[in-house]
């Protein structure tokens, strides 16, 4: 009985640590790896997400790493903008939406820490931004790039949650929030909502 109680205590402590790490934005996610050839040069790139940082290598050389102030929680490879070549899509958390160039209605510094979706294209071993969202109304829980309706065009299928305020303008995913599925499709410059379940 003492051994069972001890193991139950250890398991409970581990589960508590994992839950706390997730709720505080910790690095509790396991490493995720993928292989793709986004630039079509016949040399596959390796994508590795570990410790909320995404690293891309080709032939053992690092060709790209996510910015140090981004907290990347997931990524997908696929033709999200339907131009015939695969893209890198990232769900990430960062401070601010606009950087140094701001729209006219944004008068002060944007210090909110929220979820964003960024899309990159790989050309000649250089990642170029295709689309970088402002902070999202609903944070991404998970997402995939696939043809949902059979029309031959990819959609971005997103499971969305809700934010919870941590402190000031810093937010995290509310783990107990209801989820909804949104289906988005690329149109010219950005995504248009096709369906919300």
Please give the residue ranges for each predicted region:
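Beta-propeller-forming repeat regions
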Residues: 2-197
């Amino acid at each position: 009985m003492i051994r069972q109680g001890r193991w139950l205590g250890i398991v409970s402590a581990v589960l508590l640590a994992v839950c706390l790490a997730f709720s505080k934005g910790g690095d509790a996610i396991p490493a995720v790896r993928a292989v793709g050839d986004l630039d079509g040069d016949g040399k596959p790139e390796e994508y590795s997400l570990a410790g909320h940082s995404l690293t891309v290598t080709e032939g053992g050389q690092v060709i790209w790493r996510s910015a140090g102030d981004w907290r990347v929680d997931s990524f997908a490879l696929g033709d999200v903008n339907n131009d015939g070549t695969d893209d890198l899509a990232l769900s990430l958390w960062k401070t601010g939406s606009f950087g140094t160039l701001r729209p006219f209605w944004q008068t002060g510094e944007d210090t909110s820490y929220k979820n964003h979706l960024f899309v990159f294209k790989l050309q000649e071993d250089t990642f170029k931004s295709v689309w970088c969202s402002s902070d999202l109304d609903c944070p991404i829980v998970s997402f995939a790039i696939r043809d949902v309706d059979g029309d031959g065009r990819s959609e971005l299928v997103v499971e969305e949650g809700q934010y919870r305020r941590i402190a000031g303008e810093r937010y995290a995913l509310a783990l107990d929030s209801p989820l909804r599925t949104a289906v988005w499709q690329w149109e010219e410059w950005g995504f248009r909502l096709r369906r919300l379940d």
